[in-house]
From Swiss-Prot:
Pathway: Aminoacyl-tRNA biosynthesis; selenocysteinyl-tRNA(Sec) biosynthesis; L-seryl-tRNA(Sec) from L-serine and tRNA(Sec): step 1/1
Keywords noted in UniProt: Aminoacyl-tRNA synthetase, ATP-binding, Cytoplasm, Ligase, Nucleotide-binding, Protein biosynthesis
Protein name (database record): Serine--tRNA ligase
A GO cellular component annotation in the UniProt record: cytoplasm
UniProt keyword annotation of ATP-binding present: yes
Biological role stated in the UniProt entry: Catalyzes the attachment of serine to tRNA(Ser). Is also able to aminoacylate tRNA(Sec) with serine, to form the misacylated tRNA L-seryl-tRNA(Sec), which will be further converted into selenocysteinyl-tRNA(Sec).
Record-listed E.C. numbers: 6.1.1.11
Disulfide cysteine pairs (residue numbers): none
Domain notes per entry: Consists of two distinct domains, a catalytic core and a N-terminal extension that is involved in tRNA binding.
GO terms, molecular function: ATP binding; serine-tRNA ligase activity
Subunit structure: Homodimer. The tRNA molecule binds across the dimer.
One of the protein's GO biological processes: seryl-tRNA aminoacylation
Length: 429
């Protein structure tokens, strides 16, 4: 959520910055709401002054010799009228404040200056590449053909029988590799990158989703649970992990906070009809290892570079070629101020496909969820900056391994880094 004071002072500059996203900020609507708020505040102040004046009259009447009960009775009607009007104005002011908050909740984050202009993913800018795409001495198969031919392997038919489209069943060595990837990623981030592993609920309330920016704008992308309580299946571990700091003041000596977490993720993919309908690239349920950081404001830009490097390290250890792109304004996520996508090479498609997004949200999420830290220089609470990134999406990493490590006999070589997690298994057959 944007700072309302910044909107009042620099509305035109913010409007210009948001245009990089293709978003038009309605400053007239904001000005009208803010004027209503001021009017309600002024009316409340006037009524409070009237009440104070009426109460003072009671004292003056008593001083003039009137009995206490008689003095109170004389101004009772006036006080009652004032109190009734004051209650109405307080309720009106709250309604206006709620309206302003909803207006602010619907405004995306301001892109950083480094974010390139552009409309969609075609305008994203490549930053760097690592590794050389493998040239296979045979026609590469896609991960579906490879996985379905493995012993056990992938089974989309039974998954559809259970749950419909965009689900998968894995068994045998493939299921073990999927689990091995999760353990491998968590170990690297915990042991080498200094993240604290956390376990969180997979169901959250609406306020948690509002805090990170999924609600109210993206309700159609979520799975909501039917029952007495309003709960949602998490679309990413970002939601519960970032909200660990909601309504808290973090002490400076506990900063930065770095968390890594494995969760299943659930998405309706409402806007993805017809895209990646084959295989595991885009599913309603998938696993992800997430990185979340909460840092001092002056540290967040450097933290994004480090976090992105931590995600890249997984691909490097697995020897999977990839590239990093910076997202243009039109492709930037709603809550993000700057995002790097990491894209892994898929031989069957002869292109790079997204496997991770790493974002700096600055104080956009922390203002929504009131996540603060105590600045030792001022002694006052200030908003933290939040960041997160996929490190990595487990299913897509599995897809990349199947395709990049495939052999002409249909088997798949197990990457050396994973073999300790696979009981020494060197090949899936």
């Amino acid at each position: 959520m944007l700072d309302i004071r910044a909107l009042r002072q620099d509305g035109e500059a913010i409007k210009a910055a948001l245009s990089k996203r293709g978003y038009t900020l309605d400053l007239e609507e904001f000005a009208a709401l803010d004027a209503k708020r001021k009017q309600a505040d002024m009316r409340s102040q006037e009524l409070q002054a009237d009440r104070k004046k009426a109460s003072k009259q009671v004292g003056e009447l008593i001083k003039s010799g009137m009995a206490v009960d008689e003095a109170k009775a004389q101004v009772a009607d006036a006080l009652q009228t004032i109190d009734t009007e004051l209650d109405k104005e307080v309720a009106s002011a709250k309604a206006i404040q709620d309206e302003i908050r909803e207006y602010l909740m619907g405004i995306p984050n301001v892109p950083q200056e480094a974010v390139p202009a552009g409309n969609d993913e075609d305008d994203n800018v490549e930053v760097r590449r690592w590794g050389t795409p493998k040239t296979l001495p045979f026609e590469p198969k896609d991960h579906v053909d490879i996985g379905e031919a493995l012993e056990g392997g992938l089974d989309f038919e039974r998954a559809a029988k259970l749950s419909g489209a965009r689900f998968a069943v894995m068994s045998g060595g493939l299921a073990r590799m999927h689990r091995a990837l999760i353990d491998f990623m968590l170990d690297i981030h915990s042991d080498e990158h200094g993240y604290q592993e956390v376990y969180v609920p997979f169901l959250v309330g609406p306020e948690a989703l509002r805090g990170t920016g999924q609600l109210p704008k993206f309700a159609e992308d979520l799975f909501k649970i039917e029952g007495e309580r309003e709960l949602y299946l998490i679309p990413t571990a970002e939601v519960p992990v970032t909200n660990l700091a909601a309504d808290e003041i973090l002490e400076a000596n506990t900063m930065p906070r770095r968390y890594t977490c494995h969760t299943p993720c659930f998405r309706s993919e409402a806007g993805s009809h017809g895209r990646d309908t084959r295989g595991m690239i885009r599913q309603h349920q998938f696993e992800k290892v997430e990185l979340v950081q909460m840092v001092r404001p002056e540290e967040s830009d450097a933290a994004l570079e480090a976090l992105t490097g931590h995600a890249e390290a997984i691909l490097q250890k697995l020897d999977l070629p990839y590239r990093v792109v910076i997202l243009c304004g039109g492709d930037l996520g709603f809550s993000s101020s700057k995002t790097y996508d990491i894209e892994v090479w898929l031989p069957s498609q002869q292109c790079y496909r997204e496997i991770s997004s790493c974002s700096n949200f600055r104080d956009y999420q922390s203002r929504r969820m009131q996540a603060r830290w105590r600045n030792p220089e001022t002694g006052k609470p200030e908003l933290v900056h939040t960041l997160n990134g996929s490190a990595l999406a487990v299913g897509r990493t599995l897809v990349a391994i199947l395709e990049n490590y495939q052999n002409d006999d249909g088997s798949v070589t197990v990457p050396e880094a994973l073999r300790p997690y696979m009981r020494g298994l060197e090949r899936l057959k």
